[in-house]
């Protein structure tokens, strides 16, 4: 305790003092005294215990131990051994624990290696087996499945539309040997069980000779004969239809809608028995014939005289039966009296023969007529789908593959020759004046004046006299009238004509039919009226059936109306000159399209009722005249139409209501078409449309001539098919059913044309949907017989993802052309191959169990054809072809190909050239000699000794024909929410355009904008699939951007449409499986999947990539990319946290925290600055600046050519640039100089590969993608290896090698550290020689130092490195410059640097025996003329490099390789001490070599270095405001 008197005295002293300093000093003294007395008290209490403990530990215990040891006796040899082995033991402990830290970085476990390759095996085998469960798809299981598969050709069908179409469907079984007559009366037939053989009638000119038939050896390929004889008429096999495919062709489906559109009704009361017998034989013969065909047909061998009512339908059926087309056109132009002749109706051109018992399902033709009336828009959509498939399957295959463009364009030739809608001279002059003298001001004034006149016409409609301001054009001098002429339809003031064709009948309006229906009191009254004597009401209906365009019908009118202008056009008396010729142009185009007032209106229920009457009458006639137990026309049930039944209470039915256009009127349609019409002047020689280019619209020639040209791709010669003269049209097929032109349109003279843009045509045809019916009707009548035959035999094949097209070893019975989608070609090992590769040891057996039994050969994309080789050589399929995604194909049967080859020998020549080109392109190595002689040095090389590149995943995404990457669609999919998908995708799309690929990016918004009003209805899928197929033809690459939630249908669409799927991930987030990835796995897609890891800076933490890839065995490749969203560049992307509105407070808190940390760091540096030396202080400052006070948070590359987006775009588009660095020991230091020259010339590098020292330098450059750190690490490594003392300390007993390899391992590990190859910024690989399994190993994953060390393990100097039981040595023994592996990975341009030793080709001649003493004397004799004989070690080295020498020569001659060879022959393999000298040699050579290439124009084109082609996608961002 402190004495109280002392305290009192101190207080008194303080109170007496007033000085502040004295008070402070006194307080300090008090505190010191207090501490002293407290410490003395503690010392007195604890001092004895502390002293006793100290004496025991430091005095008694050591003294007792020393006394014991000193007293003990130790032999001298133990002291010597201890002094010798103690430092050794300490060194070994330090070496194993400290200096050998690299040894803890073991290679990947064998299980991990197996799992890495397991997904590729599962993908391939699952696709081969037809499903991920390993079970092969065994086809369909029921009739219903077969039927549903066949009606996919109709596209999407609504439920009620489907029921309406199929409620009259019947099934029929055919026994073996029965024949089915395929004409329009059958309907839509589908094979649901068994198979049918389609036969085509042989022309009489060909029937007399056997030259038109296939050779006997060709027909022996099949078990059945290829010809058939019925009633003395020969038929030739055209196709074999299997279960699930339709028997009807695309044209025959269109005819089901178009033929007998307004049916003929015969009055039964007035029809005589003679007239009732005048029914064509086609309606009396059953569609099915048994073996007694001739006997049954003989009973019907009678002369039939068809009446006028059946003339037009029979003519239409004749066209559908592929008869003589030109004869059909001319007969249709003849009067009815001449067309009616006593002829015996022959069998149809197409018949179906049941090779075995089979079953078919038939939808009768009446169902299509009923569908046309009840659901006209749905029927129109079906017609659009069929027209599109007709264009894509038949026309496009005939044009691009078979070269039958002339036959396709024959349609337009017939159309222009059969009709003529030439404008009058004065209207032509008006159009020419408008084009020549027209201006914008006059156009505006004219439009204003016309609008004023139209407004006045409304008031002047009832006035007796016309307005004086209006202009009148009198048309008086006309010799003849044609459809589309101004006298018939153009509303001008003109004089009516009383002359008309005798065959013309005025057609009543639909309103009159409706009025008749309303006037009927009951359905019975309607029935009586139909059966009554007053049949004149229906005479117009019988004459209003669709007629051929070539018939040139006269003007609709008659003597009942003297002035047609006062009756038909009373609402438009006032018009201008421009509106007149516009209307005339539109009517002329309508005439070619077959559009009339009746055809533009949807059918009504009256026509349906009449159709039912006509069909029922014909069916009764058919049954009564000829009955057959297998006739499908027999009605099993007799039903009445619901319209004929009247009940007191009728339950309301749910009807499928279709959207019908408002104010559908013929005049309104003409006005809307006229508004979109344009007039153009085209100078002579100008090309309007290029061949295979996008069509722009429909052209009507007003004045001048237009050439239709076709260029043969084989001889590159352009042919003129025909000339379009004034009054004709051009672009008919491309405008109406397609969007690409098969021919070129070129102006022969100065052209004045009326132009209807395709956008206007599509918009108005969608509004007036019944136009498609007339288009289909006109088209089916104009097609040539050859195209019709081709259409019947070609098949449209639709495959879903992972569905097998054909299997390996199946008979080759067809050639396939890919319309859209993607397929993968797989090859399964045979039993002999499996027996040869069977393992012998237990370890190898476990490893081989997971080796792929299926190999990916390649892939087929849009436009590719395959199967020609097997068909021409009559061999089985050599591989299996499976669909990667939804795919459409055109199938050309072998029988059709043989028929076409006989009729058109040019097709056989064309296909043979195509096959030869594919074979040469696929196996380019075969055409090169295996043994060559270099013309430069005269040395011989054998390429048979080279090692082929590893299979791996190089074939995934590569085209099977050309070997290059051919992705048509790419999907960008995030792994989780919160990633900037759209911003990243837009930048990638812009980059694709920069590298020369026409690319379009699709988001949900852009797709919905295209779908328009169909965005959310059930037609969206149909419209969407057609839209995607069209985009794949218009653009080289389509990018699908999954910018919607995971449950959105757009996300699933993006996954199903991608040839390659890019998974977007934030590298700094948690590497767990995201919700989008789960959706990807559930969809079980087999498309190539690549992972994109986004980093804010160009640095990858060691082992980070392995964490991402370990759980994702479905990822085939990965890429590291530097990307920071521009929306918030100062923060990383947080994938888990959703966007929070209150972000600014968090930002302010982080800024305050960072400021406090900066102040603390600054004070710490100031406190230690006085105590630390300058070296340590500099180190601390560097660390502080690097990790704490980083001025620039994100690293931005200085060189623009190192853009990561450009690198990704080049890789995905097959334009990657590779760098291959060869081995050569210390000579490889020159690689640094080459890299410096490459960077200075702005050449980017996308992939790096190397061998030996090339793998070391290339790995360091791929790790950082920067030359500065690479230079420093290589120089440090060269210093360690060049140290003599380090090498001497690493020597060992030379049993396997002279050194232990420890110093070498440590030097490599010092350079790479713990990083893995997956963590490299650039894709990288190195090779090594596996002396255990005698093969080349390609290393693309694992710890970098191990496999770089394996690639640098020179035999004798370093021991082989072990990897999963295999001993690996230097890769230079097999391939010192692995260029072929780089080429197999899809690189187009490869820079190869060779620094190996020169191959010694000195000729030797020392006799048949050799004395070793003479060899020694010869080496020391300076006057000897004999070269030095190699030693045993040199011979062994040459033997080891035999394969490498030949591989090097092959790499030099590989296409796309730029070969570097620095002058480093004067330097040895171990001259690492000459680092700077060798580096300068490489720098000088690289700069000079690249400069010479650039000057001579031999430097390859670098995609991405040029400015972008076309405008990029500009994003709208929010401004950076607080």
Swiss-Prot record:
Enzyme class comes to hydrolase
**Where in the numbering of this chain does the PNPLA domain appear?**
1219-1383
**Residue ranges of region Disordered?**
443-468, 485-523, 535-556, 828-852, 1125-1145
Residues annotated to bind a nucleoside 3',5'-cyclic phosphate 2: 778-918
Where is the motif (DGA/G)? 1370-1372
Give GO MF terms, alphabetically.
lysophospholipase activity
Protein function: Intracellular phospholipase B that catalyzes the double deacylation of phosphatidylcholine (PC) to glycerophosphocholine (GroPCho). Plays an important role in membrane lipid homeostasis. Responsible for the rapid PC turnover in response to inositol, elevated temperatures, or when choline is present in the growth medium.
- The molecule here is called Lysophospholipase NTE1
Species name: Eremothecium gossypii (strain ATCC 10895 / CBS 109.51 / FGSC 9923 / NRRL Y-1056)
The organism's taxonomy opens as: Eukaryota, Fungi, Dikarya, Ascomycota, Saccharomycotina
